[in-house]
Structures are given as C-alpha cells and as structure tokens.
C-alpha cells in the first residue's frame, strides 16, 4: 500500500503464498511512518466493511480464535462511539468488570503471572492523517492464557477505527495494543510488537505492526515467529470475514448451563492441582492426557453446576455417585475437593491403586442392578407393606476353563443382599454422574435422583447394543456430530436419553461440554415434580415402551468376569 491511500502491489517483494497473500515488508505502510507493513491480500476481497467488523468484533471477544494458548478474554471496558449523530459517547461504569482468579495454590509454590492488570486506560494509536481515522468502538480486554502460572495475564486495548473521509467509507482498522511497558514484558501468546493493525482499505486486507524501537531487523525474515504470526492474523481476518459474508453460523453453542468464565477458572485451578500427578502415575493402557484433561474439565463443570444448583455451600447439601466410574480419575478429583461421594464400577481398575487410601475406599467394585427390577411394584407394596422383593428368579449361564458350562440361578432376594450388587438406592441428597457409562446411560434418568449423563455407546434397558433413531429435528441437531461414521448413531442416543428424561418428568438441559472428545453432549436433569414418588408409573411405562429390561440382570452379572472396556 502507498501513502496516498491507494492499494499498492509490492514491487520489492513478490513472494506468493497458498492463501494468495503478499509479503510487503519493504513497502511503506499507509498507516504512517511508525508502522511497518507485513502482509496484504493479492487483489481485492469480496466482503464488505460490515462483514469485516462483525468478524473482528467476535475475534476481539474470543481471542482464542487466534491462539490456542489463550483461554479467553474478559471485557473490562467498552465504549461505543457509534451512537446517534450529535450525541456524546456514553460509558456505563457497570460495564467495568474486574475478574479475579484464585491461585488455587495453598503452598505458595507458584503465583499467577500478571502484568499491569490495574491499567484500564484505553491506549490511543497514531495513524496517518491521510486516512482521517477515528475510533468508533473501544475496548479494554483482559487476556487469560490457558496456563497463567506460565504465561502472564495482561490487559489490551482493542480499537475499531473508521475514516471520516467520504472517499474511504469502506475503510476500517482494527488495532491491538497490549498494556505493557517494554518488549520483555510481552507474553508468548501475542506478537512482540507495540501494536498490531489489521486494515481493510479499498477492498484490500493487510496487517501492520508498530515494532518496539530496539527490534526491526527480524521483520524481514518470514521464518521469524513474529512474522508468521502476522500471516496467521491475516488468515483469520480474511477467513472469518468471508464466513460472515456467507452467513456462517456456529455449529455448536457451548456454555448454555454453566457460566463459561467460572468453568474455565475452576478448570485451570483443578488442572494445576491434579494433572501432573494423574498423567505421571497413569496405570491404564489408554492415552493419559486425553482422559486426564477430559475428567478435569468434567469435574470443573460439575463443581460449577453444583454451585449453581445447590449454592456455594453445596458440599454440605449433596453427595455424588459416579456410576461406571472406570479409572476413577473423576472421583479422585471430586473427593480431593472435599466433595462426598462414591464411584462404582463392575471391575476394579489398575489406576485405583494410585489414589490415596481415602479415595480407594470410596471406589466400589459392584454391578448396578436398579432396584425397580428386584423390588415389588409400588401398588403391590402398598397392599403388602412387608414385601421387600418381587420373588423373581434369574438364570445366568456361566463358563469356566476347568468345569463344564453351568447355570446359576439368582433370586431377587439374593441380589438385594449381595455385596457385589448395587441397587442404586441412594440417599435423597445424591447427584448421579454417568460419564460414558455405556449400559447405564439410559437407566440413569430412571433412578430418581438429579443427574448428569454423558452418553457414549448405545444400549437398551436389557444392556444390549442398539441403535436409536433421532425422534426430532431441531436447530440443535447439528450440535451432535461425531467425526467418525457413527454420527447418526450418537445423535440418536443423545436424543433418546433426552426423550427418556422428559418422559419421566425431568426438566432437561443439554450442554456441549468443552472436553477433548467428540462425544461431549451432557444431558442434565435437576428438576422433577414427581421425584418424591419415584419409581412412578411413567418409569415402568418407559421401560416397557423400550422393550423391557429382560436380560439386564443376566448381562450385568456376566460383567463380573469380563475385562473392563476402555474409551
């Protein structure tokens, strides 16, 4: 670009890239002598200023789009100058928010890194008078990195500037200026510059820097990280502006149930406390990083959900049961956070032995047989109050490498008394967790307690693998996407768990969890007007409607001798 305000194709550097961007470091920046040109689109873009500004407004609020090192941004100050003509820009003091983050570190071994986070003053930026740019929207945002024990939290001014020149009505400039005093303060997740400018001018998109005075030579080398970052910034601005123009809508909407900021803060604290121990001592054959960080995220979500449902003192008001607890990592985290509860699984896992004794004692090797399969129907119970079981018998075939195949017959009375069986008759203050709990997934909404279930594999009430069809199509249906060929299978399972929940009276909420898994839909039931009367007739009807539960006990008892599955 040239200083007279027209789009300019560099004569000094004709480097072409796969995105048809040009490296223009040898060209004078149109923004002024203090600015350095880096990249521009080779030719005119097809999107308008309105598309560009809408896209960049989203990037300002969601800086993790540009860097995976960034967790989020908290908007501390926002001033919109684009008010009615003649009116003064208004700043609502209530918009000013200070988000404090608990170190979560009792030992004082490490502190959260922060730089100038008290500085909330908007930083202005000089630009060429030829463009007649002035701010229309000003922000101060606080950038929170994923690991704020390693990378510093900073504040940053974000400006959207438009031209007052009638010839440049489609000109728009986005400027990022970190609130730091020198290059050495610059955190890893932003380019080492005083300011970054992303300019749309005469339908050409370009990126410019104001370098620190002591460092200008590195910008001529495209292999330098700070230069590569400029390229990526242009990529993002170009891609997202095109997306707005084409009417792109987000496929998944997160944070529908639990506040995003609270969840992320809790996640970071839990990650700091527990990830190192769990990864280093992992005893399973599965990938520790995937499972550890997934369980930490689920624990963070549950804690924030419980605070929302029961209040800050939730620990004194509830306890959990993790059905199908697997490796026990989720239970370990929750129990270590002084939350009462038990984990139950059909098979003890190797990882259980790495936990402290008080955690190990809360992990139970039992199979789940819902009491509804063993107890008399409530109507019969009212007529015969002393009746404790339904008098049924259940033949189970067993095989052994030494003796011939045989059949063991269990009575409902035997199973109710067996220490190997858990009938899911929990205290009234219990909250049930079903984290990829397979055969138990569809059962959990029927057990008469608030719950969160994260479906994984489809099984019916008999424990058999089945495929459920999606009952309805809604705008949310596209949220349930698996990246393998079983998209419709998973969609059907999630939809069916929602249906079961509604069928028996639950007010259903759904959250797409921020976990490293394609099977990340959480179905949550907290409110149910009929809860005191469970199991209701609707529960029996739901089991009957789905084909009954014949075979559940036989299939469940056979789990006692089967190797555990991994997910």
Curated annotation (Swiss-Prot):
Main location: cytoplasm
Phenotype upon loss of function: Increases cellular ROS (reactive oxygen species) levels. Increases RNA level of TRM3, TRM7, and TRM13. Sensitive to oxidate stress induced by rotenone. Mildly slows cell population growth.
EC class: transferase
GO CC annotations on file: cytoplasm; cytosol
Alphabetically ordered keywords of this record: Cytoplasm, Methyltransferase, Phosphoprotein, S-adenosyl-L-methionine, Transferase, tRNA processing
Phosphoserine modifications at: 107
Subcellular localization(s) per the UniProt record: Cytoplasm
GO MF entries: tRNA (uridine) methyltransferase activity; tRNA(Ser) (uridine(44)-2'-O-)-methyltransferase activity
GO-annotated biological processes: tRNA methylation; tRNA nucleoside ribose methylation
EC number: 2.1.1.211
Disulfides per UniProt: none
Reaction equation(s) it catalyzes: uridine(44) in tRNA(Ser) + S-adenosyl-L-methionine = 2'-O-methyluridine(44) in tRNA(Ser) + S-adenosyl-L-homocysteine + H(+)
Cited function: tRNA (uracil-O(2)-)-methyltransferase, which catalyzes the formation of O(2)-methyluracil at position 44 (Um44) in tRNA(Ser).
PANTHER family (UniProt xref): TRNA (URACIL-O(2)-)-METHYLTRANSFERASE-RELATED (PTHR21210:SF0)
Miscellaneous comment: Present with 7720 molecules/cell in log phase SD medium.
Family per record: Belongs to the TRM44 family.
Name this polypeptide is given: tRNA (uracil-O(2)-)-methyltransferase
């Amino acid at each position: 670009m040239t200083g007279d305000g027209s789009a300019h194709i560099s004569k000094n550097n004709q480097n072409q890239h796969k995105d048809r961007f040009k490296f223009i470091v040898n060209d004078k920046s149109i923004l002024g002598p203090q600015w350095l040109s880096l990249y521009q689109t080779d030719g005119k873009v097809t999107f308008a200023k309105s598309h560009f500004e809408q896209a960049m407004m989203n990037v300002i609020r969601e800086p993790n789009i540009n860097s995976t090192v960034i967790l989020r941004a908290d908007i501390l100050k926002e001033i919109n100058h684009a008010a009615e003509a003649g009116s003064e820009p208004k700043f609502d003091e209530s918009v000013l928010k200070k988000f404090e983050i608990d170190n979560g570190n009792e030992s004082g071994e490490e502190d959260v890194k922060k730089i100038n986070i008290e500085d909330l003053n908007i930083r202005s930026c000089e630009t060429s008078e030829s463009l007649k740019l002035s701010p229309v929207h000003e922000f101060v945002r606080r950038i929170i990195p994923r690991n704020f024990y390693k990378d510093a939290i900073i504040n940053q001014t974000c400006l959207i500037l438009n031209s007052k020149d009638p010839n440049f009505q489609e000109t728009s400039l986005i400027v990022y200026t970190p609130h730091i005093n020198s290059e050495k303060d610059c955190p890893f997740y932003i380019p080492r510059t005083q300011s970054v400018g992303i300019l749309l001018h005469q339908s050409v998109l370009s990126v410019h820097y104001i370098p620190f005075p002591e460092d200008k030579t590195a910008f001529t080398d495209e292999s330098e990280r700070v230069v590569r970052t400029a390229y990526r910034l242009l990529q993002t601005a170009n891609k997202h502006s095109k997306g707005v123009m084409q009417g792109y809508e987000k496929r998944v909407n997160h944070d529908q149930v639990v506040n995003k900021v609270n969840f992320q803060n809790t996640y970071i604290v839990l990650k700091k406390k527990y990830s190192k121990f769990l990864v280093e001592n992992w005893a399973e054959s599965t990938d520790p990083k995937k499972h550890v960080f997934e369980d930490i995220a689920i624990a963070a979500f549950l804690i924030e959900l419980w605070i929302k449902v029961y209040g800050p003192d939730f620990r004194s008001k509830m306890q959990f049961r993790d059905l199908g607890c697997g490796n026990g990592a989720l239970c370990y985290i929750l129990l270590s956070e002084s939350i009462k509860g038990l984990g139950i699984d059909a098979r003890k896992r190797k990882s259980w032995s790495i936990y402290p004794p008080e955690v190990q004692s809360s992990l139970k090797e039992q199979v789940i047989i819902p009491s509804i399969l063993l107890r008399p129907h409530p109507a019969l119970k009212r007529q015969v109050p002393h009746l404790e079981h339904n008098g049924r018998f259940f033949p189970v075939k067993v095989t052994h490498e030494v003796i011939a195949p045989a059949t063991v017959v269990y009575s409902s009375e035997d199973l109710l008394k067996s220490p190997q069986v858990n009938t899911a008759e929990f205290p009234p203050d219990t909250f049930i967790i079903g984290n990829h709990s397979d055969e138990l997934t569809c059962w959990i909404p029927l057990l008469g307690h608030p719950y969160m279930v994260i479906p994984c594999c489809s099984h019916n009430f008999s424990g058999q693998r089945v495929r459920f069809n999606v009952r309805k199509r809604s705008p949310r249906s596209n949220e349930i996407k698996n990246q393998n060929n079983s998209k419709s299978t998973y969609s059907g399972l999630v939809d069916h768990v929602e249906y079961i929940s509604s069928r028996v009276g639950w007010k259903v909420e759904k959250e797409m969890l921020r976990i490293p898994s394609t099977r990340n839909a959480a179905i949550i039931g907290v409110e149910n007007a009929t809860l005191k009367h469970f199991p209701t007739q609707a529960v029996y009807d739901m089991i009957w409607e789905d084909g009954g539960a014949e075979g559940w006990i036989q299939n469940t008892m056979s789990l006692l001798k089967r190797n555990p599955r991994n997910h």
